[in-house]
């Protein structure tokens, strides 16, 4: 991994798809109309998940998933070199077929998968009013510097922020893929803490690829309201997700917070349910939450925290977004 630049202002079903409850295909949405049309290309080897099981699409681009009792979404691991305006589908009663369209785009990849992305966190807005300047700066920088994607690691903030943030910063208007994590202040009143987040941003854990790296989005464990998901939910999905990743491929984990103060990165759900992320070639853990500008090495991986974009950090760091570069080794 290259030095980062601060700019101011992981059991069950880990094989090829087999017969199951949910089916569909992953295709290249050439005309961008959001539906599969005759003649459009399907894609082999794309990961699709029901939030527990993870399978790869077949040679014909098709998948089949069994579903599970805690299912809410079907979602894909968006492949490198493609973007999608929706990487997930909320599961509807009586509907069993779900297709996923992806669109090619220029991720500015190097010959060995090198690329860069932009990290923001803790924007904590209540309205889109007054946010125009930093959103514009971020968009322009992403374009000028050839960012592969933008990641927001949570604390979009309460009902107002959750409802207003995505319309002002999304894959369409930023012209690069935009991904979101859930933070503690994004767990709000509802049937369960992430209900509103899910209705706007989709699943709270998922993955995507860019260049030579596999990126994993994970949720905050707690917050202002109790979440419906558990560590066990994330553990089982993550284990199945990582089982599909080629050995040695670099991984980066995104979360709102940082989970260790030691030199090992172990995802633990208790009762022996542990995943050694370092054994999966973890390169970095990228987070926010504490509102500081901080980079340190824990073992073989970097811990990278970026201060808030609109207000700066509690450590007196300037308001910032961060450019992170991945070299040929991740």
Where are these regions (language model features)?
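Extended active-site neighborhood of metal-dependent phosphoesterases/phosphodiesterases
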Residues: 80, 162-250, 271-284, 292-327
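A short, solvent-exposed loop/turn motif at the edges and junctions
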Residues: 50, 71-91
């Amino acid at each position: 991994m290259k030095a980062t630049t601060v700019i101011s202002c992981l059991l069950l079903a880990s094989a090829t798809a087999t017969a199951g409850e949910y089916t569909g295909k992953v295709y290249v949405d050439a005309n961008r109309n959001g539906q599969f049309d005759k003649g459009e290309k399907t894609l082999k080897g794309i990961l699709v998940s029901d939030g527990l099981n993870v399978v790869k699409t077949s040679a014909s681009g098709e998948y089949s998933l069994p579903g599970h009792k805690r299912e809410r979404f079907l979602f894909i691991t968006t492949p490198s070199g493609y973007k999608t305006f929706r990487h997930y589908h909320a599961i509807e009663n009586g509907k069993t077929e779900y297709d996923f369209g992806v669109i090619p785009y220029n991720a500015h990849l190097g010959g060995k998968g090198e690329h860069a992305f932009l990290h923001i966190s803790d924007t904590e807005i209540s309205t889109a009013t007054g946010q125009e300047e930093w959103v514009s700066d971020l968009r322009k920088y992403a374009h000028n510097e050839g960012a592969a994607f933008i990641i927001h690691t949570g604390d979009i903030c309460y009902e107002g922020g959750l409802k207003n943030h995505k319309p002002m910063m999304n894959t369409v208007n930023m012209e690069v893929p935009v991904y979101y994590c859930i933070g503690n202040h994004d767990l709000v009143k509802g049937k369960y803490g992430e209900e509103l987040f899910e209705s706007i941003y989709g699943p709270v854990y998922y993955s995507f690829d860019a260049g030579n790296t596999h990126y994993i989005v994970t949720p905050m464990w707690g917050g202002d309201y109790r979440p419906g998901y558990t560590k066990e939910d994330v553990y089982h999905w993550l284990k199945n997700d990582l089982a599909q990743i080629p050995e040695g491929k670099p991984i980066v984990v995104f979360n709102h917070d940082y989970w260790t103060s030691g030199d090992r990165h172990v995802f633990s759900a208790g009762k022996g349910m542990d995943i050694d992320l370092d054994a999966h070639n973890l390169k970095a853990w990228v987070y926010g939450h504490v509102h500081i500008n901080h980079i340190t090495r824990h073992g073989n991986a970097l811990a990278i925290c970026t201060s808030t974009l609109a207000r700066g950090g509690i450590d007196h760091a300037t308001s910032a977004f961060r450019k992170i570069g991945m070299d040929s080794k991740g």
